[in-house]
């Protein structure tokens, strides 16, 4: 209900200016405008208008101004005033809508937005007041037939917007039938806007009646696949608009559908066509195509000589007459109900009854079927006379006649009901002919399959059951099988217990009952989940007592398979027929014939897949109904049954949606056990299971509720322990209904809810929980209000008020200080006191106006507790927010240096000196971080310089004890924590390029873990450029390792997984945000990926890896910003031609995808950077390599240049002119294409910018070789120097590259001599003796100081990086005139780059070096 309903009606006529009439009739347009502005102001200030006042004259004058006034300003104001009248009067305005629509449509020819936009708004509001679009059908069709394209376009858009408000159950069939062919014609209009508008209108129609009906109405136009695809897209948009409108206007409790007139009379804000917005949200089937067909009078088109031929003695002539009639009926499925078909039906049934030829009789049956289908309920008067004849003819066994008779009896009875023909059916069941009995039983089976316990005619059923029971003992096997099928279908329709009561005579016959239950199960399988849900719901409605509470009705179970039927029989045994008491169903025999009620195997109960993400995505896109209700609706339950039925086993589904709460308990026990046996299946379906739990919250059985809360606790604890993220949709679908249970009277139930809320607080954090807690304060239940306030107080006390400041907690809680309930009052006061502790007097301002009594209560509590303003201390930071969590690990985590190998055995240590360690089995390892990179080594390495402890790491430990479910997460000691998160991520990204496979893989797993955390992935996204560069370096190393014959599958899998997740992106309103990657980075990653594909993909073992890399390259095209992407691709092609890497063809193929992306994204391009890349390519290819101008690569690049020019226009030429030495081919191509564009009058699609890419700080990717790692280990860990030296010797002996690197180190590094002596000493004695400990300390200090300061960097050059771009960096117009100035951005580019250290870091270095000198 909107605010309009609470406003008072206002008569605006007395509020108009005294000279209003004079001004509105003035000849000066300024005065007329002044009058209209005054009227508009009054209408704006008074949104609800009096329905007793007469506004006809005023609205008529506005209509005249809109139609005749020559001034566009006056017309626009008149349109706005009419819209305000429509909004203010709503349903009472409908009488004015008819005359106004033609005027509005006629004025739509105006293109100026000043008038067009008010007209659009006016038409929307006027249309909402109409009871149905059919009332304005003629005006709409006339407007669509106008020659002016603007009128046609705006009218079609108006129709589309109005149809977006219509629910399928209230579809204006006549209007749709008339307008769809017109829209179909307009889809071929010469004007593109008219075509798009008509397609949008057809999309709105398709949402209502379905695509099949739209195709039928469009006829030949539906063969255009492109148009139908667009219509489908607009249909999806219409669905979203309808859902949005429905959510906006739906009242708290969805009422049943009402007629448009009733809605309009009640002042519904949406008017006639929008009445669907407040109707029930039950799923609506696709519209019946029959409703949109033209009625056909078959009697006036009867074949020539029909009357004569039908009476002919020759069966061929009778057959020919009936074939002509059948062809006519088949071609026109909908018959005119006004015609009199009595004589024709009588003649056909006579032929069916008397004709001796089965071909003629079969044709007569088909004709009767066609007439019944064409007339539908209008055929009902003939059903009683035709039905006995059909049953009698069932004695014919031949399919030629039998099959048409089956279709005929179904069609005839569909026009009436089973009760009307009950006596006829009963008579047919008593016939001695077995074929008649068989077909009659099968007919009943088909009837029962369409009925439920509500629609089943019970009296008729009771009269039919004895005959069916009798048939179950018939000597003919087909009769017996047919009767079992009928009784199985009956059991499906009315439920098992009522069926067993009706079948008491054969209840003790296990053979018969097993056959019936077999057909019962087949009937359930044929019906499908949706039909079963409706069926069982009707069963429970029929069984429910008259005074049943509404919540009981809104949670119907699903179905009743055989595995629960034994339980039902044991709980409520049926009374056997008299004389059969001793033949009660034996328990043992049941256990042999039927499966006992035992929980299925845990691993089969729920599927383990990734459908959860898709469900959440569809719910965001409104493709699924939002889980938001005051009481569960049929649509919500049906949707949950469908979704859960796709994941759960049938036996579990039957227990979850059973009527008996004992079955719920059995299902809950099975699900709780899954937490131990198959936790991943619970996590994969946690959203659905928690929704099912919310349905149980609306029930009152204490035992079931306790068990449900136990399952909820198990699920949320599993989510917390495995650090599985919970989406906002998942939380909002569960928590509000969980909080309802905080108001329960039983303390144990409230305690369970508190535990669950505490766990959820750890998972999602107070910021997400608090809005739902505040909303729960609206409850009338005092316990619920007090419990929610206690949780809010806990949040504020522990996390402070700052994270919750935006939620206005104080203002929401303040009114509860005056609550009637003492517990609520105390809890509210405590919340405000907690706020005062953090905010001080600002709390009073945030709380707003409070009653003096309430304020004094809070002040008294503050004084009594002695709380000082601003004394609050955050005891624990809010959990669930943007941080990086570490999964719990088994065993201790140990410190190890950045380059230590993982392959070393675990050797606990005991500290003996500052440098040396002695192994001892009794000392446990200690914990610390692992990596120490140069970027931030001063924050950690210098602090540990005084007491260096080198500890050998153990083997990696699994972080999850269960083999069936493992988190894809590294368990190393360097797992990223919430402390120094940014630095840790930076270290991990740098380690991606490590030459040690285990270090690189570990870093990739850590980055992947962060990317999987929605709250933290932005920390990696903004470093995407560095991740790509590090990955490119690692892929180059992978190629070398692969060529050397080593296994690279682990590294490759980790790398591709990380990059795929990185490029999956974050979902935004407009799709995926482009990743920040510079052209050089794009070139590097593209080149590395393609080289891997070529070198690895040619081998059998690398085929799978190459496929992953191929998809990775395609994903990269979709995610990178277009200018950087094109520049990177051109640079990669240039480099490939220069170095002959063999990837040129692949780069060309990838580049073609850039054109497709340009069409999709329509983004601006940076012409300066792009032209620079093209120029470099042409210089390389044409000047340096002297390639032919007709070479395929040259032509491909020419094509891309043409696309850029068509997109950007003259900006490309300006960019080329700024080049100091543009290549001749480049300028020639640009001039040629621009000349062509001028000749053909082609405008640029999206003129771009000349700005070059802003220079960014270069983040170097540190790649430490294996030689460097080994040498660092020797200097860090002198106690294990011998082992490290052995590793170094093995490494330098393995390849010439390692040997050369080692020699280079000895030559250039200050520590080279020391390393050389240590290696030589170890080679001679196999051990190293350190006599002077202070020398060792000095060496270690020097090594750490060198590691801290990093390598010496060369002085940055003072000239720009690219001399060809000098004129774009130095601003002066031209350079010869006046002094040139250097912009700030360009100044940064040419400024020398020097290493800088903070004062603290320099002080630490000086202090350390001084201490070393003193030794």
From Swiss-Prot:
HEAT repeats lie at residues 30-68, 95-132, 135-172, 179-217, 339-377, 381-418, 420-457, 464-502, 706-743, 764-801, 804-841. Its main location: cytoplasm. Keywords: Cell cycle, Cell division, Coiled coil, Cytoplasm, Cytoskeleton, Meiosis, Microtubule, Mitosis, Repeat. Residues 251-530 are annotated as: TOG 2. Residues 243-278, 544-603, 867-914 are annotated as: Disordered. One of its GO terms (cellular component) is meiotic spindle. It is found in: Cytoplasm, Cytoskeleton, Spindle pole; Cytoplasm, Cytoskeleton, Microtubule organizing center, Centrosome; Cytoplasm. SMART domains: TOG. GO terms for molecular function: microtubule binding; microtubule plus end polymerase; microtubule plus-end binding. SUPFAM superfamilies: ARM repeat (SSF48371). Plays a major role in organizing microtubules and spindle poles during mitosis and meiosis in one-cell stage embryos. Required for default nucleus positioning in oocytes. Interacts with tac-1 to form a heterodimer. This is Zygote defective protein 9. It comes from Caenorhabditis elegans. The lineage of its organism: Eukaryota, Metazoa, Ecdysozoa, Nematoda, Chromadorea. The gene is zyg-9.
């Amino acid at each position: 209900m909107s605010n309009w309903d609470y406003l008072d009606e206002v008569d605006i006529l007395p509020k108009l200016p005294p000279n209003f009439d004079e001004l509105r009739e003035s000849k000066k347009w300024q005065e007329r405008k002044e009058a209209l502005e005054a009227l508009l102001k009054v209408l704006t200030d008074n949104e609800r208008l009096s329905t007793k006042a007469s506004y006809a004259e005023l609205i008529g004058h506005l209509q005249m101004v809109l139609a005749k006034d020559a001034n566009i300003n006056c017309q626009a104001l008149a349109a706005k005033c009419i819209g305000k009248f429509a909004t203010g009067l709503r349903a009472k305005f409908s009488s004015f809508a008819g005359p106004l629509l033609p005027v509005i449509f006629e004025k739509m020819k105006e293109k100026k937005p000043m008038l067009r936009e008010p007209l659009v708004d006016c038409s929307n509001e006027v249309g909402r007041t109409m009871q149905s679009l059919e009332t304005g059908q003629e005006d709409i069709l006339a407007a669509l037939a106008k020659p002016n394209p603007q009128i046609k376009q705006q009218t079609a858009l108006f129709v589309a917007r109005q149809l977006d408000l219509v629910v399928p159950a209230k579809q204006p069939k006549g209007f749709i039938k008339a307008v769809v062919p017109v829209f179909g014609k307009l889809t071929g209009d010469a004007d593109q806007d008219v075509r798009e508008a008509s397609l949008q209108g057809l999309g709105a129609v398709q949402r209502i009646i379905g695509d099949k009906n739209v195709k039928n109405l469009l006829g030949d136009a539906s063969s255009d696949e492109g148009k139908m695809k667009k219509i489908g897209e607009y249909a999806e948009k219409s669905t979203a608009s309808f859902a949005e409108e429905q959510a906006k206007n739906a009242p708290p409790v969805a009422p049943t559908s009402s007629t448009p007139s009733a809605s309009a009379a009640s002042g519904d804000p949406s008017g006639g066509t929008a009445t669907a917005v407040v109707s029930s949200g039950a799923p609506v089937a696709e519209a019946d195509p029959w409703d949109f067909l033209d009625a056909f009078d078959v009697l006036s088109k009867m074949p020539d000589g029909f009357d004569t031929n039908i009476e002919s003695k020759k069966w061929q002539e009778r057959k020919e007459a009936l074939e002509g009639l059948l062809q006519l009926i088949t071609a026109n499925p909908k018959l005119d109900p006004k015609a009199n078909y009595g004589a024709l039906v009588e003649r056909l049934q006579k032929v069916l009854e008397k004709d001796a030829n089965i071909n003629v009789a079969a044709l007569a049956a088909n004709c009767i079927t066609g007439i019944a289908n064409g007339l539908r309920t209008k055929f009902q008067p003939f059903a009683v006379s035709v039905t006995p004849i059909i049953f009698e003819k069932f004695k014919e066994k031949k399919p030629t006649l039998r099959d048409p008779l089956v279709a005929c009896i179904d069609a005839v009875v569909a026009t009436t009901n089973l009760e009307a023909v009950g006596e006829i059916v009963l008579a047919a069941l008593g016939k001695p002919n077995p074929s008649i009995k068989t077909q009659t039983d099968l007919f009943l089976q088909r009837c029962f399959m369409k009925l439920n316990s509500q629609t089943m005619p019970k009296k008729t059923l009771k009269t039919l059951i004895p005959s069916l029971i009798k048939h179950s003992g018939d000597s003919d096997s087909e009769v017996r099988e047919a009767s079992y099928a009928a009784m199985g279908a009956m059991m499906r329709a009315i439920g098992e217990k009522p069926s067993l009561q009706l079948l008491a005579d054969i209840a003790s016959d296990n053979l018969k009952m097993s056959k019936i239950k077999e057909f019962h199960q087949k009937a359930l399988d044929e019906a499908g989940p949706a039909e079963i849900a409706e069926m069982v719901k009707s069963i429970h409605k029929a069984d429910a007592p008259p005074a049943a509470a509404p919540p009981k009705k809104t949670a119907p179970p699903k179905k009743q398979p055989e595995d629960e039927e034994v339980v039902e029989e044991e709980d409520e045994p049926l009374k056997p027929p008299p004389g059969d008491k001793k033949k009660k169903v034996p328990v043992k025999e049941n256990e042999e014939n039927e499966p006992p009620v035992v929980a299925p195997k845990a691993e089969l109960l729920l599927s383990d897949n990734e459908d959860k993400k898709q469900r959440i995505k569809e719910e965001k896109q409104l493709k699924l109904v939002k889980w938001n209700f005051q009481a569960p609706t049929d649509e919500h339950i049906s949707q949950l049954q469908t979704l859960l039925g796709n994941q759960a086993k049938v036996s579990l589904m039957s227990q979850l949606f059973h009527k008996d709460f004992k079955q719920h308990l059995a299902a809950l026990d099975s699900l709780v056990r899954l937490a131990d046996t198959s936790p991943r299946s619970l996590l994969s379906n946690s959203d659905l299971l928690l929704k099912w739990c919310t349905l149980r919250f609306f029930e009152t059985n204490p035992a079931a509720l306790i068990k449900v809360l136990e399952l909820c606790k198990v699920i949320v604890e599993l989510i917390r322990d495995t650090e599985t993220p919970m989406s906002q949709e998942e939380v909002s679908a569960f928590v509000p209904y969980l909080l309802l249970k905080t108001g329960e009277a039983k303390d144990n139930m409230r305690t369970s809810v508190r535990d669950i809320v505490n766990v959820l607080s750890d998972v999602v954090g107070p910021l997400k929980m608090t809005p739902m807690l505040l909303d729960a304060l609206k409850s009338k239940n005092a316990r619920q209000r007090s419990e929610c306030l206690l949780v809010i107080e806990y949040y504020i006390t522990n996390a402070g008020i700052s994270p919750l400041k935006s939620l206005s907690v104080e203002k929401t809680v303040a009114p509860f200080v005056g609550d009637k309930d003492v517990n609520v009052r105390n809890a509210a006061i405590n919340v405000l006191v907690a706020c005062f502790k953090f905010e001080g007097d600002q709390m009073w301002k945030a709380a707003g106006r409070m009653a003096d009594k309430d304020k004094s209560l809070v002040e008294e509590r503050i004084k009594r507790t002695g709380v000082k303003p601003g004394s609050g201390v955050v005891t624990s930071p809010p959990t669930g927010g943007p941080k990086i969590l570490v999964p719990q690990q088994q065993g201790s985590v140990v410190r190890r240096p950045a380059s230590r190998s993982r392959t070393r055995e675990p050797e606990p240590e005991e500290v003996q000196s500052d440098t040396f360690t002695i192994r001892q089995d009794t000392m446990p390892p200690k914990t610390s971080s692992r990596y120490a990179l140069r970027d931030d080594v001063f924050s950690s390495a210098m602090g540990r310089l005084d007491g260096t402890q080198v500890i050998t790491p153990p083997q990696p430990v699994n972080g999850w004890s269960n083999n069936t479910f493992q988190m894809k997460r590294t368990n190393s000691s360097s797992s990223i924590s919430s402390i120094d998160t940014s630095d840790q991520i930076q270290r991990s990204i740098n380690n991606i390029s490590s030459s040690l496979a285990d270090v690189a893989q570990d870093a990739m797993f850590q980055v992947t873990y962060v990317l999987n955390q929605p709250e933290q992935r932005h920390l990696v996204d903004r470093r995407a450029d560095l991740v790509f560069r590090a990955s490119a370096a690692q892929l180059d190393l992978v190629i070398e390792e692969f060529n050397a014959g080593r296994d690279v599958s682990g590294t490759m899998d980790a790398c591709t997984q990380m990059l795929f997740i990185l490029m999956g992106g974050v979902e935004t309103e407009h799709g995926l945000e482009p990743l920040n990657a510079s052209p050089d980075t794009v070139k590097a990653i593209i080149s590395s990926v393609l080289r891997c594909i070529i070198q690895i993909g040619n081998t059998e073992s690398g085929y799978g890896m190459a496929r992953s890399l191929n998809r990775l390259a395609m994903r990269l095209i979709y995610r990178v910003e277009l200018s950087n992407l094109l520049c990177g691709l051109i640079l990669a092609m240039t480099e490939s031609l220069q170095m002959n890497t063999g990837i040129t063809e692949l780069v060309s193929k990838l580049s073609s995808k850039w054109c497709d992306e340009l069409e999709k994204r329509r983004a601006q391009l940076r012409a300066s950077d792009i032209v620079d890349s093209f120029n470099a390519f042409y210089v390389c290819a044409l000047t340096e390599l002297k390639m032919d101008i007709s070479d395929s690569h040259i032509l491909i690049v020419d094509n891309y240049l043409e696309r850029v020019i068509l997109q950007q226009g003259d900006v490309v030429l300006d960019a080329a002119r700024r080049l100091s030495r543009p290549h001749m081919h480049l300028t020639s191509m640009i001039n040629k294409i621009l000349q062509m564009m001028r000749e053909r009058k082609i405008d640029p699609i999206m003129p771009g910018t000349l700005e070059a890419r802003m220079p960014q700080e270069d983040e170097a990717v540190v790649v430490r070789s294996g030689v460097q790692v080994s040498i660092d280990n020797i200097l860090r860990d002198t106690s294990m120097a011998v082992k490290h030296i052995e590793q170094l010797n093995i490494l330098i002996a393995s390849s010439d590259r390692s040997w050369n690197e080692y020699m280079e180190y000895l030559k250039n590094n200050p520590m080279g001599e020391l390393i050389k002596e240590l290696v030589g000493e170890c080679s001679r004695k196999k051990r190293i003796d350190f006599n002077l400990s202070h020398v060792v300390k000095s060496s270690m200090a020097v090594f750490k100081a060198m590691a801290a300061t990093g390598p010496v960097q060369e002085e940055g050059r003072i000239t720009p990086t690219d001399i060809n771009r000098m004129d774009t960096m130095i601003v002066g117009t031209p350079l010869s005139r006046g002094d040139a100035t250097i912009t700030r951005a360009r100044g940064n580019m040419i400024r020398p780059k020097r290493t800088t250290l903070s004062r603290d870091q320099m002080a630490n270095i000086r202090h350390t070096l001084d201490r070393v000198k003193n030794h």
